[in-house]
Amino acid sequence: MRANPHPLLTALAAASLLLSACNSQNDSNSANAVSPSGASVSSSEVTTSNPNLKLDLSCDDATFPSTLFAQCEQTNVAHTFEATQEQLNPAFQQRLQAQNAANLQASLERSINDPSWNLPPAYGNTGVTPLCAAGFGPCVGDPFRYPGVDGPDGNTFYQKEAEVVPVVYYDQGCARISGHVWRPRNAGNKKLPAIVVKNGSVQASEQLYWWAVQALVRDGYMVLTSDPRGQGQSDAATPTGEQGGNLNGAVFFQGLVNDIDFLLSSPNKPYPHQAQCAGTYPTKTASFNPFYDSLDANRIGLAGHSYGAGGVTWVQSYDAPDSKPWPGLLTKKNPVKVIVAWDALGSRETPNAATLTSLAGSGSAGALPSNPLTAPTDAPPVSARVPALGFSSEYGFTPVPFVRKPPREEHLAAFNQWSAANVPVMQITIAGTTHLDYSPGFGLPASSWCPKIENNACVGGWAKPMILHYTLAWMDRYLKNPDEPGYADADARLLDDTDWASRLSFHFASARKFTTRNGQLIQSDDIRALYR
């Protein structure tokens, strides 16, 4: 996407990166405040966890155009180049190249052992397509998070912390879906809450989300990951040629319903599409969830990125009075209890609300476009049915400085829909982030996610720790039982802004509205403004 050169870009380029960041903290107490947008916020949210937190909101208040706006924006957009700079580390490059070779070898061996994965070219499967079928380059994700890698996120995780089983199962069109089921090791007889993770489009593969999956497993969750039809190691098309991926956005919600059915399946309730499609290919396919005996079917959550965030927004809507009935085949009612949408939670007006660019508003050209030839035609109307946490990026796919003063409430459409329905909701926009902060991979513009390599693992980062903090706290708040780790302090984690308020966007308001377990209503349409 191109824009005519703007004179402000020259000023931005010349602005000093050493100027004080707009998000500094000091130890003054916060009281009732007025947000930069003029909306009132409640001092009751300044909890005992962060009573002395105060932010410098000069960047929030900066007018456009101005020298201050240019200085703030120059510092902010610099975050989007951190990841690619970190990846020049020789230790990262060495591990990446080793995993490139290992993934390519595994892909070739799969094709040799089961040639049916090499479908006629018209179907799109060739051994190295779909794009991430061979799992190299950006498709590797974090190269330290694979079995066989010495380190806490490699061998230690797979041998001591988790059980991970690869699975292949059919979708409703008899395309093969490649995925994994994960659970904490030594779960014993415990019934576990479960999360289904749905990839983004543009060929994102499941490995790009293992950074979040490992954290969920460590937090006590069973997790189902897979590549949607048309992406990664799944079939590019059905046997009749029906496409997936961006050519058929329905796979991001219809496929998610299939995923939920597979999660719920057991020997007594086999996965329905297995019987329908068995024998289509010689590939060994699963009839049921291998960890069915550990699943608590009453505690299921969803997390999705990009088109997958649109998918979780749609799927949670099923069974709402103003939407469509639940289409799953193993339960009569929608079993989803909570969702997290990584860029972004959709609204009825804009179901796919992902930020694509800083050059246009996210409610218009910046939102995920719908091709009238391929856009879903039977998606359920978006309805606020279950608690939802939404994240939005600032720069989308284009790490280009803002040449406008965006409306502060621009990312709050879904928040407002959930809030009006009195359904718990939280919306977070992290400063200096791109759409690819949620699917980090080699060469992809994003904020820092591997600033240090310690014990053969990526440590630290800008947005990643914050995304994990709120994702885990939100899931724990609505899925954990009282006797499980994460239950007791979930509310406190959602309200503890000490480490994170300074990383919230100064362009766009972040907001929250939910009731704590002790009955306190928490409501703010601008979290940063609490700490003026």
Model-assigned labels for residue ranges:
Residues G38-P121, A431-L436, P440-R532:
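Alpha/beta-hydrolase-fold serine-hydrolase catalytic core, especially in secreted/extracellular enzymes
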Residues A187-L192, V197-D235, R348-E349, T398-P401:
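Short substrate-entry loop that stabilizes the transition state in hydrolases
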Residues L119-K190:
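N-terminal cap/lid segment of alpha/beta-hydrolase-fold proteins
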Residues P327-H435:
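The feature captures the conserved acid-bearing segment of alpha/beta-hydrolase catalytic domains
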Residues L264, A309-S323:
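Short glycine-enriched nucleophile-adjacent loop
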Residues N23-N26:
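Bacterial signal peptide processing site
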Residues G245-A297, W314:
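Alpha/beta-hydrolase active-site loop
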Residues L18-A21:
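C-terminal motif of bacterial Sec signal peptides marking the signal peptidase cleavage site
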